[in-house]
Amino acid sequence: MSKSRLTVFSFVRRFLLRLMVVLAVFWAGGIALFSVAPVPFSAVMVERQVSAWLHGNFRYVAHSDWVSMDQISPWMGLAVIAAEDQKFPEHRGFDVASIEKALAHNERNENRIRGASTISQQTAKNLFLWDGRSWVRKGLEAGLTLGIETVWSKKRILTVYLNIAEFGDGVFGVEAAAQRYFHKPASKLTRSEAALLAAVLPNPLRFKVSSPSGYVRSRQAWILRQMYQLGGEPFMQQHQLD
């Protein structure tokens, strides 16, 4: 290898190492800060806003209103746990059994990819990372998930998740969603309304709360059954999530 190539390789390596150090410090600071402070915006919100501007849509506004857990109906927390991650109170960020099932499914059905992300993983991804399925992003997601699981309580993870989750075009967080679709604060959401919001979470830009498809309605009904099987509101109290 020539001296010039060695110099370029050395420069690139130093640059990447420094970039990783800067990002690690930034993310560690964010995890520490948002363990107590409200989250003003997420990486997904920034990505959606910038994408809208680049496509000439200057009317788009990624809107979110932060609320604490005592300002959110307990049905909402229960609904997302029932829909997305029923082992949330028990695991340490990763549901190994679900991951194994998803991998087996994806091997058999390459055109229908199934995910197995926990609420903790989704929170880390939505807050700090970009969209995508690359191994690099997955690795960063795993590290950030371990970070928030170590520093934050389960209640804090759920609170942040509910405040940054995407519920529609430009609608982020359960307070903005409750106001947009039901014209009420998140604290007043009913069991059925909470289940409907949770039903669109797999793809909130495709599935609509305002005009739910048959699939969304069937998923809402399934979530309601799962909420009942989990034990209803006492489930949240039992695991100190309310």
Curated annotation (Swiss-Prot):
Top-rank lineage group of the source organism: Bacteria
EC numbers: 2.4.99.28
Organism this protein belongs to: Shigella boydii serotype 4 (strain Sb227)
Topology of this chain in the membrane: Single-pass membrane protein
Chief location: membrane
Annotated protein name in UniProt: Biosynthetic peptidoglycan transglycosylase
Gene designation: mtgA
Family indicated by similarity: Belongs to the glycosyltransferase 51 family.
PANTHER family xref list: BIOSYNTHETIC PEPTIDOGLYCAN TRANSGLYCOSYLASE, MONOFUNCTIONAL BIOSYNTHETIC PEPTIDOGLYCAN TRANSGLYCOSYLASE
